[in-house]
Amino acid sequence: MKVGVYGASGRIGKLLLEELKGGYKGLELSSVFVRQKCETDFSSFSHAPLVTNDLKAFVKACECVVDFSLPKGVDHLLDVLLECPKILVSGTTGLEKETLEKMQKLALKAPLLHAHNMSIGIMMLNQLAFLTSLKLKDADIEIVETHHNLKKDAPSGTALSLYETCTKARGYDEKNALITHREGLRSKESIGIATLRGGDVAGKHTIGFYLEGEYIELSHTATNRSIFAKGALEVALWLKDKAAKKYEISEMFG
């Protein structure tokens, strides 16, 4: 399957190019979208991709777009994909409501998966968080996330997805249960997210379930960003030949 990388100059984008260098499990890098000159030398790649700043040409040259870009970039990408539908794997966080609505429209035309985190470990953490939230009904839930000092969105998309998992399990009001800045006493049906930024931390997420006299913490730490690139490519392989729909990463492993 021919893959196009959107957001190739970013941290994960560069790792995607490296993974696709020799062809990842039969995936071929066919196109790379760049707004400025690309730093990557493609002479050693098994196939020379189209490197372009023409978004339509980029999309037409591939069968699947793997996106790790910025929110505005995803919005522009979706405009083109709605005209020329292709499989979409997106790991970009902080998307606006209008962009998510465009994604839903694309799902009527092509298979896609949008996830805040593509790692297997986070998928398992979500499942454990749901089960623990359901079983420990009296536990207070708090989430702590830590990332590098250049991360733009806060809280992280992964922390918000974990929050959504816990609210669904508990039946909390998703819009009103979130606390990112706390003053005074803790309200019962609330879940706090604490955000830490520093150094070059790839990502750490911890969910605490606090009871009287004891507590449980579930934690995931990313020690190498390559897990996100490899995870995204595994998703691309899984989506091949799937029907048009917006899939959840839990379906892939469930």
From Swiss-Prot:
CDD domains in UniProt: DHDPR_N (cd02274)
Disulphide-bonded residues: none
One example of a Gene Ontology biological process annotation: diaminopimelate biosynthetic process
Cited Pfam families: DapB_C (PF05173), DapB_N (PF01113)
Catalyzed reactions per annotation: (S)-2,3,4,5-tetrahydrodipicolinate + NAD(+) + H2O = (2S,4S)-4-hydroxy-2,3,4,5-tetrahydrodipicolinate + NADH + H(+); (S)-2,3,4,5-tetrahydrodipicolinate + NADP(+) + H2O = (2S,4S)-4-hydroxy-2,3,4,5-tetrahydrodipicolinate + NADPH + H(+)
An annotated Gene Ontology molecular function: 4-hydroxy-tetrahydrodipicolinate reductase
Keyword Cytoplasm on entry: yes
Protein name stated in the entry: 4-hydroxy-tetrahydrodipicolinate reductase
Entry annotated with the keyword Amino-acid biosynthesis: yes
Function of the molecule: Catalyzes the conversion of 4-hydroxy-tetrahydrodipicolinate (HTPA) to tetrahydrodipicolinate.
Ligand binding (NADP(+)): 35
Alphabetized Gene3D superfamilies for the sequence: Dihydrodipicolinate Reductase, domain 2, NAD(P)-binding Rossmann-like Domain
Ligand binding ((S)-2,3,4,5-tetrahydrodipicolinate): 148, 157-158
Family to which this protein belongs: Belongs to the DapB family.
EC assignment: 1.17.1.8
Binding-site residues, NAD(+): 7-12, 91-93, 115-118
NCBIfam families: dapB
Catalytic center residues: 147, 151
Keyword line: Amino-acid biosynthesis, Cytoplasm, Diaminopimelate biosynthesis, Lysine biosynthesis, NAD, NADP, Oxidoreductase
Compartments where found: Cytoplasm
Species the sequence originates in: Helicobacter pylori (strain J99 / ATCC 700824)
First-listed, main subcellular location of the protein, grouped into a coarse class: cytoplasm
